[in-house]
Structures are given as C-alpha cells and as structure tokens.
Amino acid sequence: MAAIRKKLVIVGDGACGKTCLLIVFSKDQFPDVYVPTVFENYVADIEVDGKQVELALWDTAGQEDYDRLRPLSYPDTDVILMCFSIDSPDSLENIPEKWTPEVRHFCPNVPIILVGNKRDLRSDPQTVRELAKMKQEPVKPEQGRAIAEQIGAFAYLECSAKTKDGIREVFEKATQAALQQKKKKKSKCMIL
C-alpha cells in the first residue's frame, strides 16, 4: 500500500529552532552551527494511527527579508507547525501579531500546531539570567496554551531538539491534524 503524502510547512521567527526541529526529526541529528534558512525541503516517513504517511517538510525563513518569498511555500499545505522559542517571549508575541495573520491569509482552514521550541532552556540558569536582565522570563506552558487557544490552534506542544524531548509527539500530532483535514477537504469545485 502506498504511503499517504502530506505537506507540512514550518513557520516562526528567525532562530526560534525551526530547522533544528526538522533535522532532528528527519535525520536524528542536532546541527551544531546556526545557518539562517532561506528555503529547505526534507522528507520523513511516520506511522500514525496505523497509517503510513510520507511527510514533506518545508522549512521557511523567519527573517523579515523573506516575507515576500515565504508565501511561495504555502500552496497545498496540509498542516502548519507555528513555532516560537521558549527562551524568547518576543517570538511568542509574534505568533498572534505576525504569523497567525500571514498563515490564515495564505492557508485558511489549514490546521496549526503551535510549538514551543527549546524547552530545555526554560530551566537553564544562564538563559534565566539573560532574560532577567531585560525584565523577562522564559515562556511558561500556560502562556503557550493561552496563545494556542487564542489563535484556534489544533494543539499546543513543547519540545527540545537538543535533547530530542517531545519531537516525535510534535510530528505525530501534526500528522493526525493533516489526516483529519483530508476528510473535510473532499469537496472540490467542478466547472461543467
């Protein structure tokens, strides 16, 4: 039986951990150096609810310089991973301010999984100290859940690509969301 194909697009601020999340899931290795993404594609196979799914993973650039290029990734998307970094409250603020309006414009009705990346840094003493200098603190789980509810996300999950904690759950949930979407999307327009 052929695998079901689904397209996943990942969005979020620059340096919030999008590429690491995709690489750890698809290649099971954590990249040592940060290189800003312009546009990358990966493919990974996952089994969810007894179904074999081939996930096309579309990485995007979060930097504002790419705001006009990024929409080229959106056509035929089945699920969106919308990411922020737990060590960057500003990146969470940009979820309802920037990312949700953009995604809802180009991908109306596509399920969104809100993902808090870099969960390991929530309790990292150096991260906590650095944020305290700016009168900030790491994002709390309830803050993430509140934003997920506000934007109508399918789910809210947290993970750490560095420790591999929660990675599989993110992609299982995203695949479930993409598979559920299929049932609703059957009616296509016909011109006679």
From Swiss-Prot:
One of its GO terms (biological process) is skeletal muscle myosin thick filament assembly. A motif (Effector region) lies at residues 34-42. The keyword Ribosomal protein does not apply. Disruption phenotype: RNAi-mediated knockdown predominantly results in embryonic arrest with surviving embryos developing elongation-defective uncoordinated kinky larvae. Defective ventral migration of P cells leading to defective gonad development. Defective establishment of anterior-posterior cell polarity in one-cell embryos. Abolished cortical contractility in early embryos. The modification Cysteine methyl ester is found at residue 189. Its main location: membrane. This is Ras-like GTP-binding protein rhoA. It comes from Caenorhabditis elegans.
